[in-house]
């Protein structure tokens, strides 16, 4: 048994490769925290990447969901680096977390008197880039001014919100995704791109091995985000006594719309 989700009913779980090690981890929300669990974190001594308070916990982040303690979350690799980001909304905030360490990458004030709902990922406008769709209501909005949820990433919460909200990257850097997310237990193989339901469903784990994570894929007529590395080289004389020694220096800039892989070689 794993601790954490016992605070509340526990939200619907997700399965994805959160830390980029090629193996799936799983995550769930409780009334007070969002938890990502990894089998690696059951080892003794625990690996340094495991920063959670309990064995098995890769990381955890403080949240607020006293309404139900059972909200769900979704997962998507927004920047195409083969590491999943977490998308979760509690009573007060929509947040996007870095999969490996739980760093908050994005936050928006979205209030809710929660139940079983969750944000979902889909290309809602057909532009070839994923969007975040999240429901909101004003039931618990007045409770978002306490020490836990009054501010996030330097931004105050403000008044309660309501309605269906869709978020996108204004620079269109998010990777492409399907235009469909058809049910609470969505897992890609349960529905076709045209909304058709397969008579015999293919096993998700044989191809994707995830759960509540939408798939990437280019849409016809749209452009997939790509990295674009440019470099600049400078040579200056050494500051020492010998002016015939020169020290080269260089800078590399990514002017594209997708991240570049770590350890990319460069020559000059």
Locations of the language-model features?
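Extracellular/luminal regions of secreted and cell-surface proteins that mediate adhesion/ECM remodeling
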Residues: 220-268
């Amino acid at each position: 048994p794993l601790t954490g989700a016992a605070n509340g009913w526990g939200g619907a779980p997700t399965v994805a490769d959160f830390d980029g090690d090629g193996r799936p981890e799983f995550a769930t929300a409780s009334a007070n925290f969002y938890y990502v669990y990894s089998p690696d974190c059951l080892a003794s001594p625990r690996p340094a990447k495991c920063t959670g308070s309990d064995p098995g916990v890769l990381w955890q982040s403080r949240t607020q969901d006293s309404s139900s303690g059972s909200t769900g979350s979704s997962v998507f690799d927004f920047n195409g680096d083969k590491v999943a980001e977490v998308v979760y909304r509690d009573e007060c905030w929509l947040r996007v977390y870095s999969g490996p360490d739980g760093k908050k990458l994005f936050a928006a004030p979205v209030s809710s008197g929660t139940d079983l709902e969750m944000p979902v990922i889909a290309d809602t406008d057909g532009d070839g880039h994923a969007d975040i769709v999240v429901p909101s209501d004003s039931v618990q909005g007045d409770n978002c001014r306490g020490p836990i949820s009054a501010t996030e990433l330097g931004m105050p919460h403000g008044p309660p919100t309501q309605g269906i909200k869709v978020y996108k990257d204004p620079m269109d850097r998010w990777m492409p995704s399907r235009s469909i997310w058809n049910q609470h237990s969505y897992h890609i193989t349960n529905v076709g791109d045209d909304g058709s339901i397969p008579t015999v469903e293919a096993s998700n784990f044989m191809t994707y091995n995830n759960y509540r994570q939408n798939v990437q894929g280019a849409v016809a007529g749209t452009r997939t985000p790509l990295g674009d590395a440019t470099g600049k080289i400078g040579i200056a004389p050494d500051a020492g006594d010998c002016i015939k020694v020169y020290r080269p220096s260089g800078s590399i800039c990514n002017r594209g719309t997708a991240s570049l892989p770590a350890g990319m070689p460069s020559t000059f």
